[in-house]
């Protein structure tokens, strides 16, 4: 009985000692060693990772607030330069997004994935937390949906959108987040619908409307919206009639 009591006390004290080794500070009051955080209400594990005199070290894991405690994100500080590589997961373990954070802002390439898929939905590039370079968005069939050039977080350059079959829908240009220069819009088959020019985000000059590859109307920029409404109504009626004919 005495021997059993001693063993029990040893196990209990060992457990307490192990707990004492978690969430500790160094002599300067900086977090040091293994740290674990918990969800406020459930008290389930929220994260775990290691600090070295106040600095994150290695891989930190973050858990959802369920009994399963699924890993929903990791932050890798292995470079030791203060940066961390973040990977976000859904509750089935599929990647949602991943990329680098430096000084608490996005840096370099970031990837976003289609739901429950390894296929990339969006690729974008950051410099000091701002979008820079070409941002691309993809359909689930892997065809390009959109490509936009950014500089310092603003659209600067080409902006093209495509349908799921890879046909160009819009061919635009931006300067400091405002439409500038020639803009061309297409239908789903690659034929022009209308085109014109922009300046400082506003339509200028004459705008042309097309049917079957030929110009059918040309209007001043200030009359574009009114003409567009009539043009689209005409297109919808023509499309509806075509569909009716196809059902006969």
Model-derived features with residue positions:
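Bacterial Sec-dependent N-terminal signal peptides
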Residues: 1-23
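Glycine/tyrosine- and acidic-biased, solvent-exposed loop/turn segments at the edges of beta-strands
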Residues: 17-248
């Amino acid at each position: 009985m005495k021997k059993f009591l001693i063993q029990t006390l040893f196990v209990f004290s060992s457990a307490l000692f192990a707990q004492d080794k978690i969430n500790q500070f160094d002599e300067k009051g900086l977090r040091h060693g293994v740290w674990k955080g918990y969800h406020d209400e459930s008290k389930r594990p929220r994260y775990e990772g290691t600090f070295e005199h106040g600095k994150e070290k290695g891989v930190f894991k973050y858990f959802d607030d369920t009994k399963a405690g699924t890993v929903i994100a990791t932050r890798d500080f292995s470079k030791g330069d203060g940066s961390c590589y973040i990977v976000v997961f859904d509750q089935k373990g599929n990647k949602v997004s991943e990329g680098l954070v430096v000084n608490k802002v996005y840096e370099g390439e970031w990837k976003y994935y289609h739901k429950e898929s390894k296929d990339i939905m969006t690729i974008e590039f950051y410099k000091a937390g701002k979008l820079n370079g070409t941002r691309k968005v993809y359909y689930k069939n892997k065809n390009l949906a959109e490509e936009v050039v950014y500089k310092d977080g603003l659209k600067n350059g080409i902006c093209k959108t495509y349908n799921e079959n890879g046909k160009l829908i819009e061919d635009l240009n931006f300067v400091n987040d405002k439409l500038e220069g020639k803009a061309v819009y297409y239908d789903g088959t690659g034929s022009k619908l209308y085109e014109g020019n922009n300046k400082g985000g506003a339509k200028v000059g004459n705008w042309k409307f097309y049917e079957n590859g030929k110009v059918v109307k040309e209007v001043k920029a200030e009359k574009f919206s009114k003409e567009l409404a009539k043009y689209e109504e005409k297109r919808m009626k023509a499309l509806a009639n075509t569909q009716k004919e196809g059902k006969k």
